[in-house]
């Protein structure tokens, strides 16, 4: 018995002394190299490697290399991808509170949105994502600016969208929003959009200026109309399958670095918006600013009524944030 005990102790000592295997985390995003989200995540990876002496590293797969958002989320849920930055649309069905952030004209402006996601409400929504059946861990938020409609003609009021097929993200709330604004909302993946604009499958779409510019949509649609109908934060999540394989210290470190990435991405975002506006102007894009936002706000009230009826207290808290 004594000999067995010594062998057991020796084995335990060897196990404790053995170095932990290095782990390369796989991160993915639909946006190209140099995009604010990509840079912020790459910097997170560098900090992670430095803090763990390269025991934990990160490899970024940008530009839809691993598929569109829907595909990447599914891969993360299965443990095939570790970290994904995504829009909130796909989370609506499993975390109903997320749809509150997706409602048109919820936030007064981008500063209001940032104050909300930086505070208790932002943390609560991340916790709900983590606790949901999505098999993902909510790490942090990223700015995605203000979404505006881009088309082949100017849009100033709801009547101007009549007969226009406008691509929307894959969430019924967004399709309902465009229908209420006067257009015809078409749910479509991002990977299909450029060719669909070229061939006339859709007449336009809506997104922020950096995406409009980096995805070269301006080569097809020359009117960028400041409808300002959506100001939506985006979320980056960790596969819970992968997360549960990490020790508590590594989990805490990743959460800390994620909060830092959230703030860093914001600065990168603001700089990129200015750069994109300059590029759009140089490429001959007409930016329509004299939009009747009050008319669009009024037109989308039924959408807020429909999707916000169960979350009146949460909406009131959001609106109270200064």
Task: Name each model feature, range by range.
Residues 1-9:
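Bacterial N-terminal signal peptides that target proteins for export
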Residues 16-22:
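Sec/Tat signal peptide C-region and signal peptidase I cleavage site
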Residues 11, 23-113, 121, 129-322:
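N-terminal secretory/targeting leader peptides
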Residues 9-16:
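Hydrophobic helical h-region of N-terminal Sec-dependent signal peptides
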